[in-house]
């Protein structure tokens, strides 16, 4: 179940993105109701552990950023990756981790906001014992918003 903050942020952003991305002029707001977008399991090639991705809106010519809720179960994480136009993460629940290549692992908590600059190699996911959900807003450049790399090893994940 989503928290009121998740529902509010998701509803506001979806409404804005849908209205801005419509092919025809719109006389008013468009609303996509919470829970109407199906979640998918994060692919094994780019995630370790159980991850659910709920795509909220796609990048459009009007707003060149996509958005999704990503939920990582305890111990789950992304592979190393970069974003050609950057990514902002808003942790909405739980406890997580992130790491920039060559730097220490950082802990994330609900309410934290992370800016991942373009081209910076990093990963993010849940803590070993607590799930974490974040809202990911990823900029797109030439239709691409991520470059996936190798998986994060258990040693990299557990090193503090």
Regions found by a protein language model. Give the residues of each.
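A short, N-terminal "cap"/entry segment at the start of jelly-roll beta-barrel domains
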Residues: 21-64, 146-160
């Amino acid at each position: 179940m989503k928290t009121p903050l998740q529902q509010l942020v998701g509803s506001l952003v979806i409404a804005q993105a849908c209205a801005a991305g419509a092919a025809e002029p719109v006389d008013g707001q468009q609303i996509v109701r919470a829970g109407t977008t199906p979640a998918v399991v994060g692919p094994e090639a780019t995630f370790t552990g159980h991850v659910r991705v709920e795509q909220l809106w796609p990048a459009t010519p009007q707003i060149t950023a996509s958005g999704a809720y990503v939920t990582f179960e305890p111990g789950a994480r992304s592979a190393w990756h970069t974003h050609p136009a950057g990514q902002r993460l808003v942790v909405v629940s739980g406890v997580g981790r992130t790491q920039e290549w060559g730097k220490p692992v950082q802990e994330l908590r609900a309410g934290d906001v992370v800016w991942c600059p373009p081209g910076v190699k990093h990963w993010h996911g849940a803590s070993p014992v607590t799930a974490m959900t974040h809202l990911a807003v990823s900029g797109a450049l030439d239709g691409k918003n991520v470059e996936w790399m190798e998986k994060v090893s258990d040693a990299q994940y557990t090193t503090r």
